[in-house]
Structures are given as C-alpha cells and as structure tokens.
Amino acid sequence: MHAWPAPEVPELPGHGSAVRLHDTAAQGLVPTPAAAPGEAARIYVCGITPYDATHMGHANTYLTFDLIQRAWLDAGHPVSYVQNVTDVDDPLLERAAATGRDWEALAESETALFREDMTALRILPPQHYVGAVESIPLVVDLVVKLLERGAAYDVDGDVYFSVHADPAFGAVAHLDAPEMLTTFGERGGDPGRPGKKDPLDCLLWQAEREGEPSWEPGEQARAAGLKPGRPGWHIECAAIALEHLGMGIDLQGGGSDLAFPHHEMGASEAQVVTGQRPYAHSYVHSGMVGLDGEKMSKSKGNLVLVSKLRHAGVDPMAIRLALLAHHYRTDWEWTDADLVSAVARLARWRAAVSRPDGVPADDVLDAVRARIADDLDAPGALAVIDAWVARQEAADGDDTAAASAQRNTAAPGQISRITDALLGVAL
C-alpha cells in the first residue's frame, strides 16, 4: 500500500534539541527520541479504519506526530515512520453492509480520501504505509508463536491472547482492574465471553463467520490449531511494527483512546512473542477533539470533515493552524471560532512575510525550537510567530532612519522557513 507525497521540509541553521514529551507509561515528561544522536528515530502511529472520511480528531492526531517528526529531523535524526490501515474490521464491514457497498471498495475509497487530506494538510507520510489485509501472513506467524509459547489459547475456534503471559501488562495505561474491564468493554473488547481464562484476554484470530471475509492461515498454522478467519485488531499493529521497526522503538503514538486496550495489548503481545522488552521507549497520546459536548467519532456521526472544509474553499493551512492553536494533549471542542481565528492568523502571517524586508528575526528560530521541545508546545510556538508579525506590522510605514536601519531583507524568508520546517505551515 502506498502513502502520500512528502512535502519538502526546509533545512534550518543549526540543530534543535531533544524533545521532551509526555510519556503515558512513564506518567511524565521524557526526552525523545531514545536513539543516539544522528541515529534513526523509529515511530509507529496507529492509522485509520477506513469506513468514513477524515475528521478533525484524526487530523489532530496525525498533526501531532507530524510535528514530532519535524522536531526530530531538526535535531538531526532521520526518521523511520510506520503507519497502518485497519482495512478489515467490524466497523468497516458493518458500514459496508449498511450502505450496500463492497467492503474492499469502501476501504479503498476512504483510504484514498485520507491520503488527499493528509497531502493537503502537509502531513509527513510514513515510509511504510501498511494495510492489515496485506499483513495477515505476519499476524498468522505471531499467533502461531504465541500458541507455541502457551500465551494464547482456543475458544470455540477463535484464538485469544492471555494477558497473564506478560508480567508487565498494565504498565502502559496504568488503569486499575475495574477501569481496565470497563474500558475494554467500551473499546471493542468482549470481557463477558464464556470460555475465556480472563475477561481481559483479547482476540488474536477470529474464526470464519458466515458472510464475512476470511483467509486461509496455511498448513503450519492449521497444524497449530488456526482455522480460516481474520486477525484481531491489536495483533495487527504488533505484527506490522515488529516487521518494519523491530523491538525497542522510540515512540508508539495515537489518540488517547488507544492507550487502553490497544497500545497496552499490542505492547504485551510483542513483548511476549519476542521475549524482549520494552516494545516502545515512550507512548505518546494526543487528546480528543469534541463537537457539541461529545468526542468527535465516526460511530456518533458528530464530525467536522477535513475534505468538506477543503471543498468549501477553506485553506488547509488555516485548518492546520486551527489545530496547532490547541496543545496536543488537551481535550477540546471544535468551534467555528477556531477556524475564523486561524484564517485571520494565516492572513496576517502571509501579509507580514510578503513584504520586501522585515524587523529582525534572529531570535525567532531558537524561541520556536524551545517551545516545540517543551512537550510540543505548538500554541507557544504560534505566539512566537505572532509576536514577530506584530513587530512587523508596527514597523510598517515607519520610515525613520533608525527603523530602516533595523529592517533586513532576510527576515521574511527566515520566518517562512521556520513556520514551514517546524510547524508545517506553508506561507
């Protein structure tokens, strides 16, 4: 599966510093990446289930990890980035059945729209953009290994992962037992299924169901007990990450609603199947974007779609600025006022850099780098650019000798390159 075109990232003078990010597992700020200076930083971000268009919650998540990549690149780290597409799953099959569409055609069309939205928003693409369907052989291999290790078992033809196989289970999200049970049930788990050893045990391989797609696991897997079927959700990401990045990745990312059970389960499965730990050095989660008092989600239908705004003529850079105005870890409500403010900010910035010269900008790069390095403080970085723009506006029309002596022709270009390289905003 192919990703989307990569926007050019300008090189800036010098290098940024390590980025301190809030690690869900460590429950505090940690320096990232864990990779040594100059070495590649490895990041895995969970992708979409393609049964509907990209909404602001999606955009907020992928913008978060775009900023992290830009900061790592600025600090001198090449980035190895993998993202999946859950192109076979219950919500996709249910939407296809409800609309009378072929599930594969639905997944393909929504994935194509997602690529268009990411391109418009200038989100850096993954080097490996991998579908669940194409990864089924990888999943089968892991499920067989987990069975052989006694970490998985059969329930009426389905195969489940035993969470007790990983003594560190729970170390990612830090939920207590009642919270785990409730959250597991709310987010796709089946805690009440009879025959399971523990209510939290999660599905690795679902045996064939009538009217649903299934795959033949192969002779070796058949001998291990697998029947024709399809993969569970968590093991897909574990398999893809291990194949393309290996263990000990620098960062596992996604929305905060993925910390448990998805990232918890995936980490445990990877650690048990390899016998190594940690799966990831840090777990970084973006906040939820709401609308009308509820989390924006496909299932609820309370969506503000990137594509709809684009087709209405909204500049994608204004959408990007509207998202950057909120700290990545906060939960917040999308409002029309966010977009109005972002459109005005974009116009001011573009007007300021369109002038033939400008007020000094030598301190702006260090200030923006400092804000981004401090737990990805994008609102603070925007404020730095705003301050330069305000100085530029105040100097407009000041033709005194002192003012003219301070202006230089390089400043507008400096600001444009900074906003492009570190914030991804093309002026």
UniProtKB/Swiss-Prot annotation:
Q: Does the keyword Membrane apply?
A: no
Which residues bind Zn(2+) per the record?
C46, C237, H262
Q: What class of enzyme is it?
A: ligase
As recorded in UniProt, its EC number(s) are 6.3.1.13
- Has UniProt tagged this entry with the keyword Ligase? yes
Offer one Pfam family short name for this entry.
tRNA-synt_1e
Q: Which reaction does it catalyse?
A: 1D-myo-inositol 2-amino-2-deoxy-alpha-D-glucopyranoside + L-cysteine + ATP = 1D-myo-inositol 2-(L-cysteinylamino)-2-deoxy-alpha-D-glucopyranoside + AMP + diphosphate + H(+)
Motif mapping: 'KMSKS' region:
295-299
- Cofactor(s) the protein needs: Zn(2+)
InterPro entries in alphabetical order: Cys-tRNA/MSH_ligase (IPR024909), Mycothiol_ligase_MshC (IPR017812), Rossmann-like_a/b/a_fold (IPR014729), tRNA-synt_1_cat_dom (IPR032678)
Q: Where is this motif: 'ERGGDP' region?
A: 186-191
Cofactor mode of binding and number, as noted: Binds 1 zinc ion per subunit.
Q: Which NCBIfam families match?
A: mycothiol_MshC
Official protein name in the record: L-cysteine:1D-myo-inositol 2-amino-2-deoxy-alpha-D-glucopyranoside ligase
